[in-house]
Amino acid sequence: KIIFPSTHVVYEGIEDVKTNIKEDEKTKPVLSYSSSKAFNENQLKKSGKNYVILRLGSVYGYSTDSMRIDIMPNLFSKITSQNGTLKLFAGGRQVKSLVPLIDVARCFKFMEEKNNIKSEVFNLTKDTLTVKKVAEICKKNNPKIKLKETNDEVPNLGFSLSNKKLLNTGF
């Protein structure tokens, strides 16, 4: 069984805020990263091989070697640990689907062990929060940080994925 880690960013071209996107929603990749993931998803679907595609939300969490600080929760954690200022573009209204790294690892193991799950696509996400809510959680954990809302535009205000199909497998 091929377990392919894809990404929620295959929906980045959706212009309006959309919530609870299901796996059968038409993808709208824009940039090369999401386009390559969507292309590889389609190649797997046509291959005739047994696969599971996991569309990961923004993965966050502790890493022993190199933590990606271009992911909003990780960047906010770093800034919070340094008593810095969290800048909230568009007032922090962007919607984000988040998943902890530990859940990603657990899901890969779960899918590998489930022989009855074949040729399926699943959204792997745990929480849907606005950027402002994540910042408020950081502020609660470190009252010394500052939150600065801006009116700067963002490409889109985000979207959220539904994980109901995945949860129905017993995960």
What is each model feature region?
Residues 1-30:
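Conserved Rossmann-fold NAD(P)-dependent oxidoreductase catalytic core, especially the SDR/UDP-sugar
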Residues 5-6, 54-56, 124:
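Short glycine/serine/threonine-enriched helix-capping/active-site loop
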Residues 9, 58, 128:
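PG/GG-rich flexible active-site loop of Rossmann-like NAD(P)H-dependent oxidoreductases
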Residues 13-15, 62-64, 165:
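Short beta-loop-alpha junction of Rossmann-like oxidoreductase domains
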Residues 32, 36:
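Active-site helix of classical SDR
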Residues 42-96, 101-105:
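NAD(P)-dependent short-chain dehydrogenase/reductase
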Residues 84, 89-171:
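C-terminal substrate-binding subdomain of Rossmann-fold SDR/epimerase-dehydratase oxidoreductases
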